[in-house]
């Protein structure tokens, strides 16, 4: 999945979260859990966009770490809304699934970035040059 596809996917996730929160009942618990979900769910896309503009591999890893945390947190709040009876499974499960997939993508991106960073440090630049045959 390329950067633009993931930007669109995280945006669609945020829009799904917004629609879900707007559909919640107007009681104290729904408001508190809904606000938490709204914050974490919309943060996934914002932090991913920020990660795509990272200034270094370490900056990218840090920002993708936030994406991972926020996506996982979104699954948590959605699950709480479901088990507390404020959200039907048919609505909650797809959002929890997408949050899990976004979490997995973030984890894989972090692992790849760390591996690439360690490989580039392990190979001296001079070793990258191919000697000319004479």
Question: Language-model segments: which ranges?
Answer:
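Short, C-terminally biased terminal segments at protein or domain edges
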Residues: 1-134
């Amino acid at each position: 999945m390329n950067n633009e596809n993931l930007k669109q996917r995280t945006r669609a996730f945020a829009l799904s979260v917004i629609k879900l929160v707007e559909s919640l009942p107007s009681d104290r618990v729904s408001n508190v859990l809904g606000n938490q979900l709204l914050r974490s769910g919309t943060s996934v896309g914002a932090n991913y966009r920020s990660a795509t503009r990272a200034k270094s591999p370490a900056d990218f890893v840090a920002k993708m770490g936030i994406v991972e945390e926020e996506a996982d947190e979104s699954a948590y709040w959605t699950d709480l809304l479901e088990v507390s009876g404020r959200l039907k499974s048919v609505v909650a499960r797809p959002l929890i699934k997408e949050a899990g997939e976004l979490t997995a993508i973030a984890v894989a991106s972090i692992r790849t970035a760390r591996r690439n960073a360690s490989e580039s440090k392990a190979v001296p630049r001079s070793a990258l040059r191919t000697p000319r045959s004479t």
